[in-house]
A protein has these predicted regions:
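Gly/Thr-rich phosphate-binding loop signature of adenosyl cofactor/nucleotide-binding cores
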Residues: 1
Length: 114
């Protein structure tokens, strides 16, 4: 669980366990962060996995959710910051890319309204 936090080297070690010890390894985790960038461990896992089963989530609009949006206490989408925040108070919402992009644009437009 939380395989996105593994290092690429740890993923390589898991692959060695599968190949050398003939032990099946199952990993679960996110592909991308709140900025839609791959986690390094997730990228390596996808490169080496024998199979990948996607667990789908749904955006509030009904489309397939593909973005893990980080939000603050006021419900605003956070677009900058560290990829991993330990002990952070931020929350996350699964959104489709369209809704995520529209919400960011809406927030940007509000900055220019006086």
């Amino acid at each position: 669980d939380e395989a996105q936090f593994f290092t690429p080297e740890q993923i390589d070690q898991l692959r060695d366990i599968v190949d050398d010890e003939d032990i099946p390894v199952l990993c679960f985790g996110l592909r991308t962060d709140f900025q839609t960038h791959f986690f390094p461990g997730a990228r390596r896992l996808m490169e080496l996995a024998d199979s990948i089963t996607e667990i789908k989530t749904v955006c509030a609009c009904g489309r397939k959710a593909t973005v893990n949006a980080r939000i603050d206490g006021a419900g605003h989408i956070i677009t900058e910051g560290d990829q991993v925040v330990l002990g952070g108070t931020g929350a996350y919402i699964a959104m489709c890319h369209r809704c995520w992009q529209n919400k960011i644009r809406e927030q940007e437009n509000q900055l220019f309204i006086f």
